């Protein structure tokens, strides 16, 4: 009910295929041609104008990132589990690489950009799959509902995202989950790889995992601003709705947004000014509508 009510209150753009004039794009020259074989990855990043100076690198395989965290479930009982916590509390550049699969099991990962912080985050082949869920609350009818532990990426400040190498972030395979939660500002910048957001497993057929939310622009029960998402460059594939934003803007790059429900993006303001945007619906539906609406679209 809360999800349905929220959706009705939002503006949206629905399933369609929309191409806008590309204002800015990533250079098409191969970096393998520009650099001699064997050059360091950092040099390639610098060629892309990625902000790598004084960058802090987090390898998800690093045991120092793992810690025990306790949650309180709907029954008032403690639930303790091992998680990977990356808390970004200072302005700077951060590189995320590796996988959160440790000894054959996935360790749920939480990357948080604190309020008031501006961070450049470079995903360098990161593969993050969050699976855990717990009984987190009770609805007005007394029914217990489950939720994910946290989103993969939690943006309360400002996050500029770059993708050096194809990276995939996933949320648990459940009806109400989201990969990125942004109550600040998120901008996808240039890169040399694709960022994929989805529910479930990156190794599975993404066409079956396009329900739920890929990006959520609000936090329930908290009186705070809604987030903004801007696509300036790069390559984004998001399987699941982008919901609850104050503003969604696209000026460049490439984005493939797929959602099995009626609309791909819900935002108060939507501005498509450039880039290549593809919006697709559930292939099993026989109807396709073309709809772009926002308060200031």
Question: PLM features: residue spans?
Answer:
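A composition-driven surface/loop motif
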Residues: 12-15, 31-297
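Intrinsic disorder/low-complexity detector
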Residues: 25-26, 32
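Hydrophobic core
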Residues: 17-25
């Amino acid at each position: 009910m809360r999800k349905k009510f929220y959706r009705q209150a939002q503006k949206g753009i629905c399933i369609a295929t929309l191409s806008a004039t590309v204002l800015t794009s990533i250079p098409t020259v191969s970096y393998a041609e520009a650099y001699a074989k064997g050059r360091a990855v950092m040099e390639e990043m610098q060629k892309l104008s990625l902000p790598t100076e004084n960058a802090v690198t987090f390898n998800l395989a690093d045991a120092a990132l793992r810690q025990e965290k306790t949650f309180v479930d709907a029954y008032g009982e403690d639930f303790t589990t091992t998680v990977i916590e990356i808390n970004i509390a200072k302005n700077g550049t951060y590189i995320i690489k590796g996988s959160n699969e440790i000894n054959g099991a996935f360790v749920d990962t939480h990357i948080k950009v604190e309020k008031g912080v501006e961070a450049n985050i470079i995903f360098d082949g990161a593969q993050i799959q969050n699976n855990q869920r717990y009984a987190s609350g009770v609805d007005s009818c007394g029914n217990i509902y489950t939720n994910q532990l946290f989103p993969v990426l939690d943006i309360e400040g400002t996050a500029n995202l770059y993708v050096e190498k194809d990276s995939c972030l996933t949320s648990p395979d459940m009806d109400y989950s989201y990969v990125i939660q942004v109550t600040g500002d998120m901008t996808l910048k240039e890169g040399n790889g694709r960022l994929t957001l989805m529910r479930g497993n990156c190794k599975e057929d993404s066409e079956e995992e396009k329900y739920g939310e890929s990006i959520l622009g609000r936090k329930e029960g908290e009186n705070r601003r809604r987030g903004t998402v801007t696509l300036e460059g790069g390559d984004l594939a998001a399987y699941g709705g982008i919901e609850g934003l104050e503003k969604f803007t696209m000026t460049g790059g490439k984005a493939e947004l797929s959602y099995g429900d009626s609309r791909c993006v819900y935002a108060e303001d939507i501005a498509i000014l450039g880039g290549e945007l593809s919006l697709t619906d559930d292939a099993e539906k026989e109807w396709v509508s073309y709809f772009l609406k926002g308060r200031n679209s």
